[in-house]
Swiss-Prot record:
PANTHER family: PHOSPHOGLYCERATE KINASE, PHOSPHOGLYCERATE KINASE 1, CHLOROPLASTIC-RELATED. One of its GO terms (molecular function) is phosphoglycerate kinase activity. Signal peptide: none annotated. Keywords: ATP-binding, Cytoplasm, Glycolysis, Kinase, Nucleotide-binding, Transferase. It catalyses: (2R)-3-phosphoglycerate + ATP = (2R)-3-phospho-glyceroyl phosphate + ADP. It comes from the Bacteria. This is Phosphoglycerate kinase. It comes from Baumannia cicadellinicola subsp. Homalodisca coagulata. ATP binds at K198, E313, G339, G340, D341, T342. Monomer. It is found in: Cytoplasm. It is an enzyme of class 2 (transferase).
Amino acid sequence: MAVTKITDLNLKNKRVLIRADLNVPIKDGQITSYARINASLPTIITVLKQGAASVMVTSHLGRPTEGQYDENLSLYRVVNYLQQKISIPVRLIKDYLNGISFTEKQLLVLENVRFNKGETKNDETLAKQYAALCDIFIMDAFGTAHRAHASTYGIAKYAPLVCAGLLLYNELEVLSKALNQPVRPMVAIVGGSKVSTKLMLLNKLSKISDHLIVGGGIANTFLAAQGYNVGQSLLEPNLINKAKQLLKYKNILLPTDVRVSQELDNAATLKHIREVGNNEKIFDIGDESANRFAKILQQAKTILWNGPVGAFELTHFRQGTKILANAIVSSNAFSIAGGGDTLAAIDYFNLNDKISYLSTGGGAFLSFIEGKTLPAVAMLIERNKNN
């Protein structure tokens, strides 16, 4: 891969700035998942061990009004957690755009980049201010690599030296291999609510997968394209013709039985797809379909999963996603999962350590699989030519 990685550079006595993805979920003032921080730790610890003169890490958190400080979205909670994981002092720096005074043996966390006006617009002046803070910029935030922001793309343009962190490099390696050199059979699962949000993903995976399992609300449009009544289920009528075109790929697999109800909080009824009533809504795939898909998954050598196949948050619409998840982890396949809802389902079923690779990207994960250019990665590649 044409990206300089962290191990290619000598960091000793250098000022190093790491752009991590520390955008953790917060509820009632508490971090509810430390997964993104933990995923960033190997890069941070590697830099600390390399003898850098100063080590800085920054990230965005949430969506504050740009240019305004919001204590609820401050990185101070992240600092508190990092201090538990790192033996040297960890300091939060709020005012850093005009330079930083620092002492050795400290990790400096630069406050939420979205508090800086111009961050999401990739303001050139702001990008140059970031770049002036460091000798080496390490891009390690795969989750934001699809955004051309000042702290991901702009700084990479102006920093003296740039490279990919361990997390970003690993994400690119794993996903590239799965897409370009998969061990076959390759099975993909695409769930979620709307076809419109995953049209490019479906199009790409239908071409490279041996089997493409479609579930969730997305499946409703495909079922309607086959002539089935989906009642009051979530449906995108304007995409039925597109679904018909995709169904020409004979590797797309749809449920033949489903769990329905008139509302999410009502009891579920298991029905063949031909039996869905006019007032019913589909909220999960049925057991027959789930078990049929499970057998295919257990024969796979590569599995790519994005999106639950039902409303797994509710007990009566959980079974389909649970059966597929268990089939994935009991297979001998190299399994990759990405997307917030997918990772939430995996976490709910306590299968985090049984999936081969959990991608930290949501939008970036989808964009990469779809074949889109990730601006921050493209800039790293461009700079690599000149490093």
